Amino acid sequence: MKFAYRFSNLLGTVYRCGNLNFTHDGNSVISPVGNRVTVFDLKNNRSNTLPLATKYNIKCVGLSPDGRLAIIVDEGGAALLVSLVCRSVLHHFHFKGSVHSVSFSPDGRKFVVTKGNIAQMYHAPGKKREFNAFVLDKTYFGPYDETTCIDWTDDSKCFVVGSKDMSTWVFGAERWDNLIYYALSGHKDAIVACFFESNSLDLYSLSQDGALCVWQCDTPPEGLRLKAPRGWKADILQREKEEEEEDEEEGDRETTIRGKTTPAEQERVGKVKYSRLAKYFLNKEGDFNNLTSAAYHKKTHLLVTGFASGIFHLHELPEFNLIHSLSISDQRVASVAINSSGDWIAFGCSGMGQLLVWEWQSESYVLKQQGHFNSMVALAYSPDGQYIVTGGDDGKVKVWNTLSGFCFVTLTEHSSGVTGVTFTTTGHVIVTSSLDGTVRAFDLHRYRNFRTFTSPRPTQFSCVAVDSSGEIVSAGAQDSFEIFVWSMQTGRLLDVLSGHEGPVSGLCFNPMKSILASASWDKTVRLWDMFDSWRTKETLTLTSDALAVTFRPDGAELAVATLNSQITFWDPENAVQVGSIEGRHDLKTGRKELDKITAKHSAKGKAFTTLCYSADGQSILAGGMSKFVCLYHVREQILVKRFELSCNLSLDAMEEFLNRRKMTEFGNLALIDQDAGEENGVAVPLPGVRKGDMSSRHFKPEIRVTSLRFSPTGRCWAATSTEGLLIFSLDAQMLFDPFELDTSVTPGRIREALRQREFTRAILMAFRLNEKKLAQEALEAVPQNEIEVVSTSLPELYVVKVLEFLAASFEESRHLEFYLIWTQKLLMSHGQRLKSRAGQLLPVVQFLQKGLQRHLDDVSKLCDWNRFNIQYVLAVSKQRGMKRTLEPVDTEEDSDASDEDSLHLLRAAGEEEEEEMLI
């Protein structure tokens, strides 16, 4: 088994905080999600998270005009220069202060950041290699409060900065003689956004109270004059002074009097001036809805404003005509962005974690995604690995597509937190348990709740399990310590299993036998036999409270996680412990800012809360109250690899040691409400509160892993944590893993064998080298009529390798029919021999089925659409042939005559029929 799993995607969370951006082509949205960045491709319906992370939550993102570079700045002021082409970090930089916004100039040569009450302009990184990618050019002073927003003119000559001191400042990017800086006032609240008009120095400024000021400049952009160098200026001033002295002498001779302007008046002559043309108010009279975000499209003169109540307005400027107004959420609209064409508008709501893309002309949603409001608790893979279902504390159940990364259905029938989710073996039914006292079954075809299982007395269910046939549903209670068993077909309660003396923490059915394993806080694991009237077959005594239980895929082994950070392995047939793992030191828990004790002592109360076997059963994943997920080898009982889910220091319990400089005699400085001016201040959680309303919105949520699952294909695994749903997968492109390699296997010899038409030898050498491009070249070089001969000559060991390659190629390659022929010939030739190793080949077969099923769905939809269109066209063409031509309008006499003629014809036809009948 390979262990080179790497982070591949982040699901379950679509937006946290920061500003949204559209890419250069306008088809993708770049959204900051915690300390990561996700790119939503709206054209191809895919989402992908960049393989990079900052130390804190991302605060602002700036894109270069060509869309190739991005500057990502977190809350601590650390910046990353990222290439969106190769998806890698090019440079690290620290601004040594909190940055509110960053913006590139339209020509891409410079960028400006607003930090504190100043604005700093840097030279943008070029295409050549440089020792320092960020070179400071100028620092602009003026505002006395924090600066909030930036906008550039189209020619990159000037930029405008808004501030919390209710003023707007226009600065020159170059040393202009008639514009150094210009301060504009007239607002009664902090500036939220400011925008230049297209090809003009006219600008708009918006404040938090919903006021819009229109400013007109008396100078066009071409009227800006460069300031002369100091040497030239001194010569010019000296020349002017000499001319003035000569004029004075001539005046004395001719007794004429000439007036002089003061130096202040001379300074004002020829300078840029602004005047306020109009002032509009976005709020109605008596409405105190705060403006939170705004965006302006210069080509179409479209202004989009978002408010704290979840409402957004569309106005046409400068006439301020209202185009549209809509409420999209109950929470504040934190960010607004418009794409390059001006058709799509992106909205981000940080409170609910919503990301919306609205097409304002057709008044329809292009994208509408929302994560779980509270933390996710449980997850499950579908049998084919295509879908992931998650349940959260907000009572919602969401189904995610692993290929696109989007949630395509949200089930909201539960009225309280979801505690467990699972798929049936068919993959068409989802079963969930909740604290509202119900277990529900959902149909994935119609997205409806077709079964609701309840207990005779109201109880809170903590876990759920379904047997391999999909007919038996069981759920454990955390208050009555009982296990309830229902029938899926009838919905009737079959039995109530009693015996546990503590809350039931986990349930799991044996995949091969009719045995149910239940773990409880009473330090026991009970095995119940379904065919023996649900009697207790065995009781496994543990040394501590059981927190999780799971069976190996072949059902021959049982793993239990306990409160003392141990994982014990049992033989379910003989009820004998076969191994144990001590994982206390592998968890590496951190210290929370509220903890009075060190991380070393608090680790005694931390343990693994979720377990999952790999697809082949050789390894097991374990996660719990830590930022790490541990991968153990079951037989050797050793730690193989430890995966760090997050490095986000905005979460609590991330560090093992706290900064002693923050520990004062009054307590930890982190608990002092320092950000009261931002929104609602810092909410400190109540003692003992781990989840719920206070936990989801307090300043630093605690990092923890709530659920782990391996994909049935074995290529990836998923984890639900405070950060969201993270997927780790095997990246074949980054891994060189040869198979039975020797010195005779080289790319040159592989291509030489292909030229000599020795296809079998070339394929064997290509898979021994295990290079994807060489394997693809070797397989695609085989003529279609020789595939059957080559496939029969392959050894059985290499057949599995070829099937794995074909399964991966179905997700990328366009040669669908060619690879289908390869798959068919391999399975027909080696199917009987592969059947003897069905257990080991199950991940490969499921991986193959996943790719084939996706192509089947796509092709079937396209074929159905074409077939229905052809049927419609044929039906319309037949109806057109049946239509009669329009008759000319006749006079009354002609119409009477035609009526009489028709009557005569009818009578004549009737007489002929009577004669025929008589004959």
From Swiss-Prot:
Coiled coil: none
Annotated positions of the Phosphoserine modification: 895, 898, 902
Subcellular location, principal: nucleus
Signal peptide feature range: none
GO biological process: ribosomal small subunit biogenesis
Keyword Protein transport: no
Entry keyword annotation includes Oxidoreductase: no
SUPFAM superfamilies: Quinoprotein alcohol dehydrogenase-like
Biased composition (Acidic residues): 242-252, 889-900
WD repeats: 12-50, 53-93, 94-132, 142-181, 186-225, 286-325, 328-368, 371-410, 413-452, 456-498, 499-538, 541-580, 603-642, 700-740
Record localization: Nucleus, Nucleolus
Residue segments, region Disordered: 238-266, 885-919
Example of a GO cellular component annotation carried by this entry: nucleolus
Record-listed N6-acetyllysine modification sites: 55
UniProt keyword annotations, A-Z: Acetylation, Nucleus, Phosphoprotein, Repeat, WD repeat
InterPro entries named among the record's database cross-references: G-protein_beta_WD-40_rep, PWP2, Quinoprotein_ADH-like_sf, SSU_processome_Utp12, WD40/YVTN_repeat-like_dom_sf, WD40_repeat_CS, WD40_rpt
Residues where Phosphothreonine is found: 891
Annotated family: Belongs to the WD repeat PWP2 family.
Assembly mode: Part of the small subunit (SSU) processome, composed of more than 70 proteins and the RNA chaperone small nucleolar RNA (snoRNA) U3.
Known role: Part of the small subunit (SSU) processome, first precursor of the small eukaryotic ribosomal subunit. During the assembly of the SSU processome in the nucleolus, many ribosome biogenesis factors, an RNA chaperone and ribosomal proteins associate with the nascent pre-rRNA and work in concert to generate RNA folding, modifications, rearrangements and cleavage as well as targeted degradation of pre-ribosomal RNA by the RNA exosome.
Protein name per the record: Periodic tryptophan protein 2 homolog
